Amino acid sequence: MATEQRPFHLVVFGASGFTGQFVTEEVAREQIASEQSSRLPWAVAGRSKEKLQQVLEKAAQKLGRPSLSSEVGVIICDISNPASLDEMAKQAKLVLNCVGPYRFYGEPVVKACIENGTSCIDICGEPQFLELMHAKYHEKAAEKGVYIIGSSGFDSIPADLGVLYTRNQMNGTLTAVESFLTINTGPEGLCIHDGTWKSAIYGFGDKGSLRKLRSVSCLKPVPIVGTKLKRRWPVSYCRELNSYSIPFLGSDISVVKRTQRYLHENLEDSPVQYAAYVTVGGITSVIKLMFAGLFFLFFVKFSIGRQLLIKFPWLFSFGYFSKQGPTQKQMDETSFTMTFFGQGYSHGTCVEKNKPNIRICTQVKGPEAGYVATPIAMVQAAMTFLSDASDLPKGGGVFTPGAAFSRTKLIDRLNKHGIEFSVISSSEV
């Protein structure tokens, strides 16, 4: 079926999952805010019709839209049933895949979407899955003219588009960026659903697969422009932010590097070096995180250790992860700030013979990262995909957010929906 003849513009798959319910609510909010003429037909998909209806009813109550359940399609679909995945994909132009961990459940969705000419956006933060999908399916997706766009939530839209925003705001050539993520919490603290915890456990437990995948990829190194960016110590002090920091172990570095490769090889852009960190406050927080990290890295090496980590997330994460996830109050009181420190060269400066002579600082700020900012980012990526098709890379394929949306108005959309990009300072040295 041609995509213009399909009954739904987008389908939220995994709508009754912990993150999926918030994505569903965000799609509903977007559609309610739209003018009648611009509203898009959409659906939710999952294994249980009853649970899907409950999610819609909850969103209807929260948004004051009693008729929501009757306005949204419902598709029964099971990740273990390829025929049901095909049937779902045939009914949509775009699937928003919220079913993780993606290393176990992501590939069947990608495969079904490509085979049925349907594009797909996910919120995966697992580098091994993201890079594997590019290696296996980029050419197949391009042949079908569909777009598979990964990591379109908090992992890794703020980082990926934040680097592009910093590049676009610099009056010269940006050559290197360091980002520092700061999570701001209220009195009740931070809590993350254990789905993210499980993805981290499986990812660290199988690091060898990612190394092997990269070793056989035979990709040419991306050239380093200007002074090589020095990596910080595992624990370092950031004077600008008055805080200790540690390396950020999510998907941001993998995603940003893939974006920079794509932009360099396909659009001849000057590549940007990148490093990512997370601030942890004072020395007490550093000690606490060091103990948590040592426990995690020891247990994750062994099968029985991984089982214990999965069974007792609250204990081994020192209370940061739980099977219940955050309360509404915790989410309301939490926000994030991602600060980017960039360096580069003014126009006309010889890069090979000089040190960087421009500094720039930008920020991306937003609400709670996992279940407020992630749905906003995913839904605005979807709206951008559906409305700015002429600005996407030609021909389809498997893309990072930065590669897919570098020429679109996604940053403008995010700014209007509470994920704000801004320049803090810019100066010549």
UniProtKB/Swiss-Prot annotation:
Annotated family: Belongs to the saccharopine dehydrogenase family.
Modified residues (N-acetylalanine): 2
Pfam families: Sacchrp_dh_NADP (PF03435)
Residues carrying Phosphoserine: 209, 215, 217
Keyword Iron: no
InterPro entries, per the entry: NAD(P)-bd_dom_sf (IPR036291), Saccharopine_DH-like_oxidrdct (IPR051276), Sacchrp_dh_NADP-bd (IPR005097)
GO cellular component: lipid droplet; midbody; mitochondrion
Gene Ontology MF, one: oxidoreductase activity
Top EC group: oxidoreductase
Documented EC number(s): 1.-.-.-
Protein name as annotated: Saccharopine dehydrogenase-like oxidoreductase
Keywords, in A-Z order: Acetylation, Oxidoreductase, Phosphoprotein
